[in-house]
Amino acid sequence: MAKEVFQRTKPHMNVGTIGHVDHGKTTLTAAISIYCSKLNKDAKALKYEDIDNAPEEKARGITINARHIEYETANRHYAHVDCPGHADYIKNMITGAAQMDAAILLVAADSGAEPQTKEHLLLAQRMGIKKIIVFLNKLDLADPELVELVEVEVLELVEKYGFSADTPIIKGSAFGAMSNPEDPESTKCVKELLESMDNYFDLPERDIDKPFLLAVEDVFSISGRGTVATGRIERGIIKVGQEVEIVGIKETRKTTVTGVEMFQKILEQGQAGDNVGLLLRGVDKKDIERGQVLSAPGTITPHKKFKASIYCLTKEEGGRHKPFFPGYRPQFFFRTTDVTGVVALEGKEMVMPGDNVDIIVELISSIAMDKNVEFAVREGGRTVASGRILEILE
């Protein structure tokens, strides 16, 4: 069956659901999908099971990898990533967050903000997300007086992490909206959320004029066609027939793009902001991996050693309880990848939680990097610092 061509009629935006495990992120994502499919006859409704689609997730009822769905409102086309809330999987949330222009923060009204609520807010801020909308979920299970307290608490948190005091708060029950899609009262919260997204989220300015770059998130083999690399185009435009370089981790090599797709539809060209799959000529699945980038030839190079400015989280923010010293070996997260690195300090003997400091890092493998790129520093499954590259040393 021939694939349909993706029609670019509305502005495209990437959003995602973030928040603590079991606060209802996947349920809300399913409720939105079902609601939009009722408005648009071409749209496909995805149920909870379709979004939570890995066997281990079904058994545990949690989302591990970020999942993508698409839907349209009156004004926009959204790609929506459902981010995992489980602590072990925050790493995957980072790659999900790296693809979002704006986020919907889910907080269960019956339990309020929890540790991961804070960690996700911090990650959203570090990943450059400027605006969020709060969805206060499980309203049917919460005492009305408690809801008011939770609302105040969440707004304080949102402001603490640099988001606006005017952040909209939508209240409702995602489960109610998902279970009763025909009932206007149940789906009112989803309708309000989508209107709020259209009005409050600013369409991002896309770096279409810069050289092409895509951070590889996943790699698949399609029998008879070759290898597909998926990810979000960070900048530039890509068309069939263009040559690209695979950079980072291994030797840099060239290949040609033989197909561009988004949500199983063919694209005439992929552009900055699109989540795409690129079919690559003559590349074996083992030749390319998550964490590498595809780029316009000669525009980005792999490096191991750099100078960076970092902020160390305090104990209260979920960071370390004790200082770290030269020789510290955490993981550094760039775009979609984590690499172990060794820290050297200049003119300092140690770094305390809460410090802003410049460090020198040497990674154990080369990563495609450029100046000003932001990264997260993680250790033992938690974020301990965030930083930005000041200069590349080698």
Swiss-Prot record:
| E.C. designation(s) | 3.6.5.3
Annotated region (G2) at 61-65
Catalysed reactions, as listed in the record: GTP + H2O = GDP + phosphate + H(+)
Chain segments carrying region G4: 137-140
GO MF terms listed in the record are: GTP binding; GTPase activity; translation elongation factor activity
- Compartments reported by the entry: Cytoplasm
Record keywords, A-Z: Cytoplasm, Elongation factor, GTP-binding, Hydrolase, Magnesium, Metal-binding, Nucleotide-binding, Protein biosynthesis
| Positions that bind Mg(2+) | T26
Q: Where is this region: G5?
A: 173-175
Q: Where does GTP bind?
A: 19-26, 82-86, 137-140
Q: Which GO terms describe its cellular component?
A: cytosol
Check the record and name the InterPro entries matching this protein: EF-Tu_GTP-bd, EF-Tu_GTPase, EFTu-like_2, EFTU_2, G_TR_CS, P-loop_NTPase, Small_GTP-bd, T_Tr_GTP-bd_dom
Origin: domain of life: Bacteria
Into which EC class is this enzyme placed? hydrolase
Query: tr-type G domain: from which residue to which, for each copy?
Result: 10-205
- Where in this protein does the record put region G1? 19-26
Q: Where is this region: G3?
A: 82-85
Q: Which Pfam families match?
A: GTP_EFTU, GTP_EFTU_D2, GTP_EFTU_D3
Q: What is its main location?
A: cytoplasm
PANTHER family cross-referenced by the UniProt entry: ELONGATION FACTOR TU, MITOCHONDRIAL, ELONGATION FACTOR TU-RELATED
Q: Which family does it belong to?
A: Belongs to the TRAFAC class translation factor GTPase superfamily. Classic translation factor GTPase family. EF-Tu/EF-1A subfamily.
Query: What is said about its interaction partners and assembly?
Result: Monomer.
The protein's job, in short, is: GTP hydrolase that promotes the GTP-dependent binding of aminoacyl-tRNA to the A-site of ribosomes during protein biosynthesis.
| Protein name in the entry | Elongation factor Tu
Organism the protein comes from? Borreliella burgdorferi (strain ATCC 35210 / DSM 4680 / CIP 102532 / B31)
Q: Give the gene name.
A: tuf
